[in-house]
Regions:
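Short acidic/glycine-enriched loop/turn segments that link adjacent beta-strands
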Residues: 32-35
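Short beta-strand scaffold segments in enzyme catalytic cores
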Residues: 37-39, 88
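Domain-level recognition of nuclease-like catalytic cores that cleave nucleotide substrates
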Residues: 80-133
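Solvent-exposed, charged helical/coil patches
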Residues: 1-14
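Short, charged, amphipathic alpha-helix that recurs within catalytic cores of restriction-modification
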Residues: 60-82, 87
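Short beta-strand-loop-alpha-helix junction that forms the active-site gateway
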Residues: 44, 50-65
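Active-site beta-strand-loop-beta-strand hairpin of nuclease catalytic cores
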Residues: 14-27, 39-50
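Short, flexible, glycine/charge-rich loop motifs used to bind or transfer phosphoryl groups or to couple energy/partner
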Residues: 28-29, 77
């Protein structure tokens, strides 16, 4: 799992207004067994998001999959159905954000409202190739 330094804590703090724009938020308790950082509840779907500092915000999706491999594995244990989504939010030291939906087999770039970006393809981390869900 990636470390939780001061930059990661700043990313969580800065994520709160973004999350509040999407609905009510509930922060997860800290600790070694924490799976996600916050939940967003409004209409379906409920969002479980993990917020991370990104040393290379412009990295390709395959590079991000490799860098956040342990975090993605942790997020994939969350039970999923049509009523929830799992997201990874990353923030650069300059405040640039990128958002991703985590599926059982792929990472898909989304906007801050949770909508898939039309021009972006997904990346399957089970096969290591573009595509997936």
């Amino acid at each position: 799992m990636t470390g939780r330094g001061s930059r990661a804590h700043r990313a969580i703090r800065d994520a709160i207004p973004i999350a509040k724009a999407r609905g009510l938020i509930q922060m997860a308790m800290g600790g070694p067994e924490r799976i996600n950082d916050l939940s967003i509840v409004s209409k379906i779907p409920i969002v479980f998001a993990s917020i991370m500092f990104a040393p290379k915000i412009l990295a390709s999706i395959p590079e991000l999959v490799e860098y956040y491999r342990k975090d993605l594995a942790r997020l994939r244990v969350i039970a999923r159905d049509a009523a929830n989504t799992i997201e990874l939010w990353i923030r650069s030291r300059h405040g640039t954000w990128r958002f991703f939906q985590v599926t059982p087999s792929s990472l898909v770039e989304i906007d801050r409202d949770g909508n898939r970006l039309v021009s972006v393809r997904s990346f399957s981390y089970t096969t290591g190739a573009p595509g997936g869900e």
